[in-house]
């Protein structure tokens, strides 16, 4: 019996902060592996998502949002991570918000001019455009900025046109063996996913009160004798006032964050979880490259 030819390739998902890159990746994979928030720059690491369908395997890299502001060490590192993801891929999906184009979009576009891989422009959030007649002038304008492989309007939130985007992706995959088993959806560890889930809940339940000077370190992740994951998470903030925001009145906010995070972990890991959270002040961690290295923001 002749073996079927298989196809595999790497695809970078890039764009400015808060255009729906992580939502798009989660929709393609059919489950959440990249955290989402209304706040900009939710994604801090390169998240790898793997989508295998028959003979095709697409390995997606969801990057931190590229932006102009680089005052803090963590912002510089996120920009560096996003830029390096563009270098060695088979296809780049450039996600933009169809409701408006800004200077950050222009900055990303300028980086893409130097990319070797073809670029697909995914115009997201078209469901938010009430007058669809406004979309055509937007497409006409951006189509003149770069020679795109394809331009496709999508709604990552609703799943509109995602199937057609995946068809475009398949045309860029190369003949070759699959890099991951077909049941893999990410190369990230459960420990890493636990920290990301906690961070997502922090951003959701602190609203605009808490800036991005917060991170999560998993101090313990083990399966106990009863088959329950015991997870201890340390939440690091930069100031005492931020610690109080996270804990909330009588510890209620921290309790809510913990409950919601535990429920998400149990769904993702398909296992019971016992989660404990602590909050600690670590001044200046987001500007300290040694601290960022120890927290996993810099690859050794």
UniProtKB/Swiss-Prot annotation:
Segments of this protein annotated with the region G5: 154-156
Residues where GTP binds: 15-22, 62-66, 124-127
Domain (KH type-2) ranges: 206-283
Ranges for region G3: 62-65
Any GO CC annotation of this UniProt entry: plasma membrane
Superkingdom field: Bacteria
Keyword set, alphabetical order: Cell inner membrane, Cell membrane, Cytoplasm, GTP-binding, Membrane, Nucleotide-binding, Ribosome biogenesis, RNA-binding, rRNA-binding
Region feature (G4): 124-127
Function: An essential GTPase that binds both GDP and GTP, with rapid nucleotide exchange. Plays a role in 16S rRNA processing and 30S ribosomal subunit biogenesis and possibly also in cell cycle regulation and energy metabolism.
Family affiliation: Belongs to the TRAFAC class TrmE-Era-EngA-EngB-Septin-like GTPase superfamily. Era GTPase family.
Name of the protein: GTPase Era
Organism in which the protein naturally occurs: Histophilus somni (strain 129Pt) (Haemophilus somnus)
């Amino acid at each position: 019996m002749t073996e079927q030819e298989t196809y595999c390739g790497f695809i970078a998902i890039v764009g400015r902060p808060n255009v729906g890159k992580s939502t798009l990746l989660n929709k393609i994979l059919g489950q959440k592996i990249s955290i989402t928030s209304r706040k900009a720059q939710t994604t801090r690491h390169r998240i790898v998502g793997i989508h295998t369908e028959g003979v095709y395997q697409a390995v997606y890299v969801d990057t931190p949002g590229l932006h102009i502001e680089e005052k803090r060490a963590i912002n510089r590192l996120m920009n560096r991570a996003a830029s390096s993801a563009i270098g060695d891929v088979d296809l780049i999906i450039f996600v933009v918000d169809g409701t408006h184009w800004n200077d950050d979009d222009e900055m990303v576009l300028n980086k893409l001019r130097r990319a070797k891989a073809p670029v697909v422009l995914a115009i997201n959030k078209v469901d938010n455009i009430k007058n669809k007649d406004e979309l055509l002038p937007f497409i006409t304008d951006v189509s003149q900025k770069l020679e795109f492989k394809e331009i496709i309007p999508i709604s990552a939130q609703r799943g509109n046109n995602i199937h057609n985007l995946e068809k475009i992706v398949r045309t860029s995959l190369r003949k070759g063996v699959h890099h991951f088993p077909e049941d893999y959806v990410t190369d990230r560890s459960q420990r890493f996913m636990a920290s990301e889930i906690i961070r997502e809940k922090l951003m959701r339940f602190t609203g605009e009160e808490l800036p991005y000077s917060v991170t999560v370190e998993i101090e313990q992740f083990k399966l106990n004798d009863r088959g329950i994951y015991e997870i201890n998470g340390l939440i690091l903030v930069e100031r005492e006032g931020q610690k109080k925001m996270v804990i909330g009145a009588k510890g209620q906010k921290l309790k809510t964050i913990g409950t919601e995070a535990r429920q998400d972990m149990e769904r993702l890991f398909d296992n019971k979880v016992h989660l404990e959270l602590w909050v600690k002040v670590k001044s200046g961690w987001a500007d300290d490259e040694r601290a960022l290295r120890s927290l996993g923001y810099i690859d050794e």
